[in-house]
Amino acid sequence: MLQVQGVFKSYATPQGPLAVLQGVDLQLEHGSSLALMGESGSGKSTLLHLVAGLDQIDRGSIRAGRHRLDQMSEAQLAHWRRTEIGLVFQQFNLISSLPVEDNLAFQARLAGRYDPAWQAQLIERLGLGALLKRYPEQLSGGQQQRVAIGRALASRPGLLLADEPTGNLDEATSDEVLQLLLDLLKNTPTSLLMVTHSPRVAARLATRVVLHCGRLADAGER
């Protein structure tokens, strides 16, 4: 279970501190999903980065299972990211020196959870079969996004963090990715926290949470 309690975050600017999150509380149960929505600058991506341990909170607490993330060292956070979560951010961060098939398996191997049968299923579901020997620079933005999604899912993470997971995909591929995520949520204990601007994506996948000016403004069931 993921618990975000009373989280504040601000950044220094030439005009003074900019408050991005102001006392946000969220709870995400095992096997459930939550969609963060709201206008640009409302704090959605910031919250996702804080939950991933990629930035430090100013005040509050973030717990994921037995871990208190805001009290972990950088080394502990790095190990946690490698072994327990999957990340799909708008910067795909594929490894340029590895072909698609090795990019897909990279995190699963680090986590000690590489499963050839599961990887083959991901390759088929994401339509990556013809791309396995290509390198990231040879892929379109949508193709890179599909590889990033497959890499994040390959280790069957307990928590999947996704920032606009279907943002660069055509509608048919987007629907296939959404169905893959729904199947994963249904058949495994994976939890999903995602940022999306798409009401259609949020309605299919998740309970909706709206942030406004760094505060929780609204929440509703899908």
Q: Which role fits each region the language model picked out?
A:
Residues L2-C213:
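ABC family nucleotide-binding domain
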Residues C213-R222:
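Conserved switch/coupling elements of ABC/ABC-like ATPase nucleotide-binding domains
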